[in-house]
Amino acid sequence: MITRESIKLELCEAGLIAVVRARTCEQALPLSHALISGGIRAIEITFSTPDAPEAIRNVTRDLGDAAIVGAGTVVRMEQCHAALDAGARFVVSPILRTSLIAPVHNANRAIMVGAYSPTEAQTAYESGADMVKIFPADRLGPSYIKALRAPLPDLPIVPTGGVQLDTIEPFLKAGCVALGVGSSLLTKSILDSDDWPALTQLARQFSDRLKQVRQSI
């Protein structure tokens, strides 16, 4: 049985969450296949993707348990309900929108709420967020995460925004439970050209690097 706890565990085990902003609804499916082939199975389809709920539904139906498909850039309640109705296993908001937590938990799904400051991060966690999205991570860096977790060690932090191949190690060493990866993986050139072999190759670099770092720490 799929539960919010099992989904959170799967996301932590996956380690990398691909943040997908597809050009079209149809593009999300081959894109997701390419990510899976490269070893990345956690896929966050953002609401900046046209017809995002339909994209979530199609990818979930086609990939089944091979992927952990969620919805990203969720800022309104109607988006949250649409994502859950489409089969999203997790919901991600880039902002501190605690009102989304209850409906997601009522559906027995996981939610990641955005935060920037220590107060926002702790508020998200105390309000019931399963994970706390620190965004934009490139502005703050691994040293901020490490400093944040010193007084707040229980925070399940997922940095997103600017995570690169060479920052996987410092972010994990800072105590992050998973990493959200966007444009450094799903590059504009790949999306513009539908170059899925290139995406698979790049995804493999990220997933291999994650394994290497996890084995060393």
Where are each of the predicted segments found?
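Conserved N-terminal beta1-alpha1 strand-loop-helix module at the mouth
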Residues: 1-86, 106, 154, 165-166, ...
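Glycine-rich beta-to-alpha transition loops that act as phosphate-gripper elements at the mouths
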Residues: 21-23, 49, 69-77, 93-97, ...
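Catalytic cores of alpha/beta
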Residues: 30-31, 76-86, 119-127, 144, ...
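Mobile acidic interaction elements
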Residues: 33, 126, 138-141, 145-146, ...
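Conserved functional loop/turn residues at catalytic and ligand-binding sites
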Residues: 39, 63, 87, 95, ...
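Histidine/lysine/aspartate-rich catalytic loop segments that bind and position anionic ligands
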Residues: 90, 94-139
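Glycine-rich phosphate-binding active-site loops on the catalytic face of alpha/beta enzymes
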Residues: 90-100, 134-142, 176-196
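CoA-thioester-processing core
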Residues: 104-111, 142-152, 157-159
